[in-house]
Amino acid sequence: MARSGGNDGHEEELDPELFEEPSNLEGYEDGEFEEDEEEFEEEEEELEEEEDEEEEEEENVTTDEQSGSPKSSQPVKLQSSDVLDCPTCCEPLKRPIYQCSNGHLACSSCCQKLNKKCSFCRCNIGDIRCRAMEKVIEASIVPCPNAKHGCKETTTYCNQSSHEKVCKFVRCSCPVSNCNYVSSYSNLKSHACSTAHVWGEDDIHFQLVIDRPRIFNMNLGRKKTVVFKEEKEGDLIVVQAFKGLEGVYVTVNRIAHMAPGIRDLSCSLAKLNEYSTLRSGSLVKKIQKVREKMHLEDDLMWIPPKMLSGDHWKMQICIAYGYKFIHI
């Protein structure tokens, strides 16, 4: 046993365990205890999710406790909804929301794009959650923008765009060039079938029967849009042609809302030439108004220059319900 000399000249016995190396440090030099950066980030995300769940449970408990108290919550009206938007990208804030040491806010997406640097003061941001603002966002309930047209749905402020995409009361515009009629999908169909609807001289339009092919002409020199009205239901199908550097692109869309409940339409399209035919099949996409420019996400039929003879050519179309493509 080790001994140590004291001030009085006597030796004291020391516990040998004090001089033993800790067993839990074995392998430290070999790097066995080094944490992988990706694993650390995953653990951090899991901790954040657990914190969110615990926070929601605490909020529910608090709400239950407060429900029995005489003081009840009251709705609050904001003068401007801008305070609920990310000050950097101006999009609605949603959890997780972060703040820098100076109190500036940013959404999770902006934190990543700016490499965790505050866009206002350049301080670090992306580690400190702003729980208070997250509670405000979750409690912010707004009516649908189409409430005045009959929609009774309400959503949180950060999720209103998701509802707008599938709202059946969304405004649909008549595709006829000289008509300014805007209303719901059902009203638009009634409008197209009524005698009050007037087709202009420059508007190219045809009646259309489901499952029955129809030949029509397109003339890029005069009009790049052809409108078909389905004979029974009154659905409006819009065929548009867009000139490109490498030929012409043709799209087929339907004026309708995106809400579930209406049957999908499929389209079989053919470009007719004297010695050859170009065919294409796709689902008919729903839009709310005629587009002035081509969208790359649309299903397109590409017609190469060698199949074009001037601005006037002949095409054939067949519309069917569901995923049904008819060879034409």
Swiss-Prot record:
A zinc finger (SIAH-type) spans 139-197. It catalyses: S-ubiquitinyl-[E2 ubiquitin-conjugating enzyme]-L-cysteine + [acceptor protein]-L-lysine = [E2 ubiquitin-conjugating enzyme]-L-cysteine + N(6)-ubiquitinyl-[acceptor protein]-L-lysine. GO terms for molecular function: transferase activity; zinc ion binding. One of its GO terms (biological process) is protein ubiquitination. Residues 63-77 have a biased composition (Polar residues). Pathway: Protein modification; protein ubiquitination. Keywords: Metal-binding, Transferase, Ubl conjugation pathway, Zinc, Zinc-finger. Residues 136-324 are annotated as: SBD. Its EC number is 2.3.2.27. Zn(2+) 1 binds at residues 144, 151, 163, 167. It holds the Pfam family Sina_RING. Belongs to the SINA (Seven in absentia) family. This is E3 ubiquitin-protein ligase SINA-like 5. It comes from Arabidopsis thaliana.
